[in-house]
Swiss-Prot record:
The gene is Pfkfb3. Homodimer. Forms a heterodimer with PFKFB2. InterPro entries: 6Pfruct_kin, 6Phosfructo_kin, His_Pase_superF_clade-1, His_PPase_superfam, P-loop_NTPase, PG/BPGM_mutase_AS. Residues 246-555 are annotated as: Fructose-2,6-bisphosphatase. This is 6-phosphofructo-2-kinase/fructose-2,6-bisphosphatase 3. Residues 475-504 are annotated as: Disordered. SMART domains: PGAM. Residues 1-245 are annotated as: 6-phosphofructo-2-kinase. Beta-D-fructose 2,6-bisphosphate binds at residues 253, 260, 266, 334, 348, 352, 363, 389, 393. The modification Phosphoserine is found at residues 490, 496.
Length: 555
């Protein structure tokens, strides 16, 4: 008699963490891509404004529209004359009312920025030390369908706090008529006023359902709680890579190479005689700086490697530091590009940041490729980066907080070292020319681009309504994003896998001729290689090629 299979009943065992049920991860705004309000939390002189400005610079650089709203500036606008720390006493009811009104005014501007001005992230930079204030901000975010992400900076090291006060606070407008000792004393008393009512974020009880990161002792430790989305995870990743230790970053281009002399773009040519002189001059410059544990980074192209070889120091090659891929325009001069690819030339002049070379890259692509380099630069101390013009522009735009519109036109001359020293809320730049002559590869922004002339050469029927594009309209287009005329090359990866040589095909006739030559015995007799009376173009060419390969494909 066959045995009957039986299955025991599954029992569920519930182990509650506490008496209050946890909120689901999906609670909050209904839209996945809702704008985000980043809420700073912490006592004064804990680096909140430093984090706000640095994070905003990074987010804008990667293409996420972000703006800081500093409540202290609203307070200084409302109260023209700062008297003393008494303004921040918790028992000063009139001052408390003014401070709350300033916070509400800042939140109104946050709402306007995120709903009307195209912003994606607003950084609400204030102390926000009480739960009452944070609940008010949470209610504001929920009411407007915004996500809220808190960043709390905690630091109990008196040396760090005193350093922050001396470097930043005593030079603020509040203390313009005070000496350093008076300013330090008043600010310490201001901190004491906040400490009396400070309620830190509590991940175990009161604030367990909030999304936040707690930065402890200037990045020594981190506590992350309930990250909601991709952008918040990128913010966490960025904050975990930055540090405040003194260091110097040196940026320079390779020495002049043979293609620079010939006016060609891209390629992988070696140094010219003047380029080799620069490499030797750079070696002497580095020795004079007497830097401890200097790291040297180069691209994988000859010119940067040959420049680094002269330093007689260990160096690392980064593929991410390779020059922008010019696709079919590699190893051409700008005059040759204008004559061979007139439409591409016009489109690039029209919008240099978003324009992508056919089978190549755009500046926007390059920024995405360089993000890991930026993360590693933020982690390092003294570094020398030897790279290329477009790459240097992208790196410089990050450190100097330049917009996407300005980035492709930053001047980065050959044989010049840019010395970057991080300061309180930015970066100090020194340009050091090493006294070796070179050609100039900088091209100024065009005042106007005559699209109709160039486009009519290729597609006369498509652009009959276009006139001159002025600089002002180009600026507006850059703010809005990629131009609608842009050919996006969606089949091309953002970063080309290797800087390999690509065969250039100037016309469909050349393509068909090469295809016919490659397959002389494979063409079916019923398929013509050229339509009667005209060259094989467009869909006709596509149908022909598809027909050929469908007939002779083994699959």
């Amino acid at each position: 008699m066959p045995l009957e299979l039986t299955q025991s009943r599954v029992q569920k065992i519930w182990v509650p963490v506490d008496h209050r049920p946890s909120l689901p991860r999906s609670c909050g705004p209904k839209l996945t891509n809702s704008p985000t309000v980043i809420v700073m939390v912490g006592l004064p002189a804990r680096g909140k404004t430093y984090i706000s400005k640095k994070l905003t610079r990074y987010l804008n650089w990667i293409g996420v529209p972000t703006k800081v709203f500093n409540v202290g500036e609203y307070r200084r606008e409302a109260v023209k004359q700062y008297s003393s720390y008494n303004f921040f006493r918790p028992d000063n009811e009139e001052a408390m009312r003014v401070r709350k009104q300033c916070a509400l005014a800042a939140l109104r501007d946050v709402k306007s920025y995120l709903t009307k001005e195209g912003g994606q992230i607003a950084v609400f930079d204030a102390t926000n030390t009480t739960r009452e204030r944070r609940h008010m901000i949470l209610h504001f975010a929920k009411e407007n369908d915004f996500k809220a992400f808190f960043i709390e900076s905690v630091c109990d090291d008196p040396t760090v706090v005193a350093s922050n006060i001396m470097e930043v606070k005593i030079s603020s407008p509040d203390y313009k008529d005070c000496n350093s000792a008076e300013a330090m004393d008043d600010f310490m008393k201001r901190i004491n006023c906040y400490e009396a009512s400070y309620q830190p974020l509590d991940p175990d009880k009161c604030d367990r359902d909030l999304s936040f990161i707690k930065v402890i002792d200037v990045g020594r430790r981190f506590l992350v709680n309930r990250v909601q989305d991709h952008i918040q995870s990128r913010i966490v990743y960025y904050l975990m890579n930055i540090h405040v230790q003194p260091r110097t970053i040196y940026l320079c281009r390779h020495g002049e190479n043979e293609y620079n002399v010939q006016g060609k773009i891209g390629g992988d040519s070696g140094l010219s005689s003047r380029g080799k002189k620069f490499a030797n001059a750079l070696s002497k410059f580095v020795e004079e700086q007497n830097l401890k544990d200097l790291r040297v980074w180069t691209s994988q192209l000859k010119s940067t490697i040959q420049t680094a070889e002269a330093l007689r120091l260990p160096y690392e090659q980064w593929k991410a530091l390779n020059e922008i891929d010019a696709g079919v325009c590699e190893e051409l001069t700008y005059e040759e590009i204008r004559d061979t690819y007139p439409e591409e030339y016009a489109l690039r002049e029209q919008d240099k940041y978003y324009y992508r070379y056919p089978t190549g890259e755009s500046y926007q692509d390059l920024v995405q490729r360089l993000e890991p380099v930026i993360m590693e630069l933020e982690r390092q101390e003294n570094v020398l980066v030897i790279c290329h013009q477009a790459v240097l522009r992208c790196l410089l735009a990050y450190f100097l907080d330049k917009s996407a519109e300005e980035m492709p036109y930053l001047k980065c001359p050959l044989h010049t070292v840019l010395k970057l020293t991080p300061v309180a809320y930015g970066c100090r730049v020194e340009s050091i020319y090493l006294n070796v002559e070179s050609v100039s590869t900088h091209r100024e922004r065009s005042e106007a681009v005559k699209i109709q002339h160039f486009a009519s050469v290729v597609r006369p029927s498509s652009y009959t309504e276009l006139d001159f594009l002025s600089v002002e309209s180009a600026k507006q287009d850059a703010k809005k994003g990629p131009n609608p005329l842009m050919r996006r090359n969606s089949v091309t990866p953002l970063a080309s896998p290797e800087p390999t040589k690509k065969p250039r095909i100037n016309s469909f006739e050349e393509h068909v001729a090469s295809t016919s030559a490659a397959l002389p015995s494979c063409l079916p007799p019923e398929v013509p290689t050229q339509l009667p009376g005209q060259p094989l173009l467009g869909k006709a060419c596509l149908r022909t090629v598809c027909h050929i390969f469908s007939k002779f494909s083994p699959y």
